[in-house]
Amino acid sequence: MHRFFSPVFRTVFQLLIAVGLSASVSATPAAPFEDSIAQRTLACTACHGPQGRAAPDGYYPRLAGKPAGYLYNQLLNFRDGRRHYGLMTQLLEPLSDAYLMEIAQYFSSLDVPYPAPVPTAASPELLRRGERLVMQGDSNKKVPACIQCHGQAMTGVAPSVPGLLGLPRDYLNAQLGAWKSGQRHAHAPDCMRGVVARLDDGDINAVASWLAAHPLPTSTKPASKAPALPPGAVAVDCGSAPATTTATSRP
């Protein structure tokens, strides 16, 4: 014997089921809201990866463990138009200096492991050129060594100079290219723009390739001070960080 259910009955039955399910869901207690800096920076980690470890595609860089002063300066640069990325500007525009510093200090405090460097396809000759520029600079082009400001171990110098290791080659290439083309700026005197202007495209590729392939040291924490400059080193004065001591003033 077949039971027959009218369309009206079916509709009422479906509504009763829906109401019952809704009541069941609403009866489940909501998780308590945690107003923490980790929760408030979810908009950051959505792109920059959990805990600011960096996105897997290499487009969004690591935030975790970078010097607080550097992160703060970059947040200001995005908010105030010295760096250009629409989404970042929109997120930061309504935020105060004090809140940006709180964000910077939070990410700076995170000590999470770096991924292993990606093997490079760059030629040995290109890598040698990159190593020389990073470690020694090029006096003929008046280019200082990268380690002069970014630290002997290239892990950065507190409070305002970032590390250069653990970053993808494409990201490094893009940022150096942005300095060279004038798309990226810092507080005057804009030392990075002046340095990169003296590098050709091959130099930029060499530096990015060598840094991206270089293994990280055991300690990735920023150095407390920049290394002493050797005699004849090219002096650098940066608006976003305290001026480095010139070689002539060293003993």
Which residues does each predicted region cover?
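Short, recurring structural edge motifs at helix starts
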Residues: 57-61, 89-92, 159-161, 194
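His/Cys-centered metal/cofactor-coordination and adjacent catalytic loops
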Residues: 53, 112, 164
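N-terminal secretory signal peptides that target proteins for export/translocation
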Residues: 1-9
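Flexible coil segments in periplasmic/lumen-exposed cytochrome c-class electron-transfer proteins
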Residues: 30-41, 50, 86-93, 97-155, ...
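The feature marks the first
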Residues: 32-81, 85
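Extracellular/lumenal glycan-associated surfaces
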Residues: 65-68, 74, 162, 167-168, ...
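Sec/Tat signal peptide C-region and signal peptidase I cleavage site
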Residues: 24-30
